[in-house]
Amino acid sequence: GNPKKGNKALSMVPLEGQLAEADNWNYCVANVSSKQNLVDVKSNVKNSQFATPLFEFSGACSGCGETPYVKLITQLFGDREMVANATGCSSIYSGSVPSTPYTKNEKGQGPAWANSLFEDFCEFGLGMELANEKMRDRIVKLFNQILEGDNAPAEAKEVLKAWIENMYDADKTKELAPQIEAIIEQGIAAGCPVSKELKGLTQYLVKRSQWIIGGDGASYDIGYGGLDHVIASGKDVNILVLDTEVYSNTGGQSSKATPVGAIAKFAAAGKRVRKKDLGLMATTY
């Protein structure tokens, strides 16, 4: 009979009987292709779930409300995603040595993730973005050197010009990057010193999606000054606040995200002040 009949979605069974499923799983991973090219995954929530997640098997608590959002970001932007992650629940399930739930697609592309402290995670992410900007500025200067010279073929110049005009368009830069890499290889073969330098900058051709992720402890309390500074900078970064309304990772203590009247550790008689309106504060910029 079916051992799952009448049970809930997850049922505990002896491991020995499940080992045969490993072969089935490996077959599916190796042979079943992604279907995300059949729909526009960014048009609505339903379509987004056809995109392959690049965040899997995190080991977070069952029923965790944070991981679906982290997974969704990887489905939409994972192949070009950079993550600056505050310490907290999200740093535990995202980077517990020796494994990580972040993975790569069939082209070897996936999120680049790093963990920082509670108090500087936003500045850390802003630093990533500023470094990325500087490297891309260098690419523009080198491309302009090639465009001003007489050695490159006209078709190659058109591709470089198209990149400069569309360098902030993710889809366009994805399309142009392989063509530019081929042009750089041709330049190296022809002894072009500019092409040699560009070879080390090819990872910056595709527009990156910079994410800053932290919980309410980091975002509302300990790292709020940095969060405010980064929002005020106007830089092209995305901030995900995993607001559980308590300090989840340390056991449920009250934070400035905890609503008025709520009972939590350090607020046993009910929180005395209202929840800090972080969204409203962000709109002041």
Q: Which residue stretches match the model-derived regions?
A:
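N-terminal leader/propeptide and maturation segments of large enzyme subunits in energy/redox metabolism
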Residues: L117-P193, E197
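Conserved thiamine diphosphate
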Residues: N47-A60, N115-L130, K134-G149, V206, ...
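Non-heme iron-sulfur electron-transfer modules
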Residues: N2-N47, Q109, E155
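Thiamine diphosphate
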Residues: V32-S33, Y93-S94, T103, A190-C192, ...
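Extended, highly charged accessory segments
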Residues: V70-K71, L76-T87, G95-T100
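Mobile "lid/hinge" segments at catalytic clefts and subdomain interfaces of large enzymes
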Residues: G95-E133, V241-V246, Q253-S254
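Beta-sheet entry/capping signal
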Residues: N7-L10, D79-A84, C89-I92, S209-W211, ...
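Cysteine-centered iron-sulfur cluster-binding motifs in ferredoxin-type domains/subunits
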Residues: G1-N7, C61-T67
